[in-house]
Amino acid sequence: MADFFAFQWHILDDCDQRCKHCYIFSEENDKELITMNYEDIKTVLDNCLDFCQKTNRTPYFSITGGDPILHPNFWQLLELLHEKQIHYSILGNPFHITEDVAKRLKSLSCRQYQLSLDGLRETHDYFRKPGSFDITLEKIKTLQDAGVRASIMTTVSKTNIDEIPDLIDVVVENNAGLFSFARYCPTSLEKATQMTPGEYKELLEKVWQKYQDYNDSKTFFTLKDHLWTLFLYEKGLYTIPENLSDDVIYDGCNCGNSHLTILPSGDVFACRRMDSKVGNALKDSVYDIFMGENMDEYRQFENFEKCSKCELLRFCRGCPAVSYGTTHNMYSADPQCWKEI
C-alpha cells in the first residue's frame, strides 16, 4: 500500500457544544456557520482522490465538523466512502451515538470514532457542557461493543495539565481503544494559557510512566505531540537513523508534507489550527494547491528559528501551530520546547 495522505475534512460548522477552546467558535472567528452540500461533497472527494492518484498516495479522511453526524448527508458520505473502500474515521461528539448508530458505523467500515476528554469531570464539563464527561465514558463502551474503536483525544493546557495522569487512569478503566493528546493552540496572545517548557517536560515524564504501567491494557497510546521525539531522544530511546538524505523530511509535523484540511466552504488550509489558507477544493485542483507556491510557504524548513539548529530538525519541529498561536510566526521556537540550543 502507498503511503497515506491525511485529509481533515470539516463537512459542516454546526455543533451541539460551544467548547471554550474551539477555534470555530472563538471570539476572533465570529462567522456564519456553513454546511457543505452533497454535490460539493462529491466534488471535493473526487478532487482529493485525483490528487492521491497523481501522487501515488493512499487517502485517509478524518470526517469532522462541528459535529459531522448532524450533517443531513452524513450517512450518504459514509456509504460513498465505504463503496469506494476509502479509509476514514470520525471526529465528533458523543451525544448522538446509540447502539444502532455504532452498529451502522461498523457496517460502513468506520475505523475509529474520536471523542474528547479535556480533564476530569468538573474540568471537562466546564470546557464542554454539563454531563458531557459521563456521556463520553458511556459512549466509549457503546462504540467498542459495536467493534468501532473509540479513541480519546485530550487538549492539554496549563488549566488541566495536573489532571492528565489521572485522566489516563479513567480512559484505561473504561477500555478506550486509543488515547492521545495535543497542546492547546492559543487563539490570541492574551488568552494563551502557556505551560513552561519545564512543566511540559515534567508532564511527559509522568505520562510516559503511565504508558509503561498500562502497556498490557486494552488502550493503545499514541505519541501525537512531536516533542515526544525529543523526549525519547534524550532518554536514549530514539536514535537518528544513519545514511539519510540531507534534504528529506522523515517525521514530525505533517503540515506541508502529508496533510491538508478542508473546510465546509471548500477552503483548504495547510493546518486547521492556524491561519493557513492555500486554496479552495471547489475551485482549484487539490494537486495544484499542494504543489503550488502557497503551500511552499509551509515547507521552508530552514526558516525554523530554533529547530534549524537542531539535529532533530527532520524528525521533530515541535508544533508550528502552537508557535503561530503564540507569536503569529509558525517558524518561531516552540514555546514548550525545553532543549537548549
Predicted regions mapped to residue ranges:
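Exposed loop/turn and edge beta-strand positions of beta-sandwich/beta-sheet ligand-binding modules
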Residues: F5, R57-P59, G256, R272, ...
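Hydrophobic pocket-lining residues within nucleotide cofactor-binding pockets
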Residues: P68, F95-I97, V156-T159, Y184, ...
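Radical SAM enzyme [4Fe-4S]-AdoMet core and its adjacent flexible, acidic
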Residues: H10, K31-E32, M36, S107, ...
